[in-house]
Amino acid sequence: MARATGRAGFPRTARLLSPGDFARVFALRRSAASGPLVLYACPAVSAVQPARLGLSVSSRIGNAVVRNRWKRRLREAFRQVRARAGLPQGNDFVLVVRSAAVPAGAAGARQVEEMICDLATRVVARPGYAAAAAAAKQGAGPQPTAQPPRRR
């Protein structure tokens, strides 16, 4: 099946794939929330790397149909915002869904695009993000805490 022309792609290089990538983004603890979405951000390893996206849609949100609908809507919104250069480069983002209500129709798609763009701009513009980014790149950033040994 051929791709539609003019459609922005979503290659592997635009996705967070490994659990380590997700852990690094969550460990920095920089987030912004709006409506049903929470966006976590972390500077990428390379400042010239395009923005990458990871999705977290819990089974608490609904059944597989609802979760996959959210994922499709978020991936497409990210593709559109990224194609317009609406996201700051050199950052990794994780979107967490908090609500099961998926915005419907074309108006809903535009609403999700605006939310993603707004959240990304807000979290990157917050005071201390640049300092945390520099510390994280030097390895002095927040490290995941080791779990104490479990007692039996």
Where are each of the predicted segments found?
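Positively charged, solvent-exposed patches that mediate nucleic-acid binding
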Residues: 1-152
